[in-house]
C-alpha cells in the first residue's frame, strides 16, 4: 500500500458502476463456492476428503478438483472483503462531502449488522460471516479517517496476524492428519450428537446444538478477522488511489498491480495442481 494524499469527497452521489460490477461478481462467486454446503452431507464431504487425501480419486477427478480450486478457492471471498472496503471508503468520502460525523453513523450500521449476523447464526446457519464483517467494520471505520501511514501500519499488522494464524492452522492440520486416518463427522465433538443420536432431529434441537457449541462454530469467524481487515483496507486504498474508479488515474500503479497478480497470484494458485 503506497502513501496517498487525504481522501477527497466524491463530487456527486452517482452510482459507481465498477463497484456494482465487482460486488455482483463477488456475491455470485461466493454463492457458487458455498452452495455445496447446502447440498452435500457431512458424510459425503468426509468421504470425498478421504479419497482426495489418500489418492483414491482418478487423475481426471483430481485435476478437476484442482482446477475448481484454482478458479474459485478464496478468490471471491477475498474480492468480497475488498469490495466491502471499497464501499466503506465511498461512504466515508460521501460523509465528508455532506459534513456528517464519522464514524458514528457507520458504527450504527456495523452494530446493526452484528445483530443481524447473531440472529442469522442462531436461527439459520452456523457458518455466518456477517458478524465478522461487522467487527471488521467497527475496527476499520475510524482508521479510514487516519493518515495513510497509519492505515498502512494496521494493514501490515493485520496481514502478519493472518499469516501467523494460517501457518498455525496448517501445522496443526498436518500433524492431525499425519496421526491417523481422516476424521469422520462423528469424531467431531460438535457434530457427535448431530450424527449419532437416535431419534428425530428437529429445528429446536438445531438451535440448541448451535448454542451449545457457539465457540466451536465461531472460531473460524474470529480467526478470519485479521485477514478480512487487511483486505478491507486494501479496498479502501484502491478507492483513494482511483486505480479502479477512474480509468485514467494511476496507469503505472494499475500496471504494477496487474504484474503482481501474474507473477505472484497466478503461480501461487497453480500450486494447487501439485500432488
Sequence positions of predicted segments:
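Specific transmembrane alpha-helix
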Residues: 78-93, 131-144, 223-246
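N-terminal signal-anchor module of multipass membrane proteins
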Residues: 2-84, 91
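Internal alpha-helical transmembrane segments
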Residues: 90, 94, 100-169
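C-terminal TM-helix exit segments that contain a strictly Trp-centered aromatic cap at the helix terminus
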Residues: 33-37, 164-176, 267-274
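Long hydrophobic alpha-helical segments that form multi-pass transmembrane helix bundles
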Residues: 157-236
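Hydrophobic alpha-helical transmembrane segments of integral membrane proteins
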Residues: 17-22, 27, 71-74, 78-82, ...
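Solvent-exposed interhelical
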Residues: 103, 139-154, 237-260
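Alpha-helical transmembrane segments and their helix-start/interface "positive-inside/aromatic belt" motifs
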Residues: 13-31, 148-160, 251-260
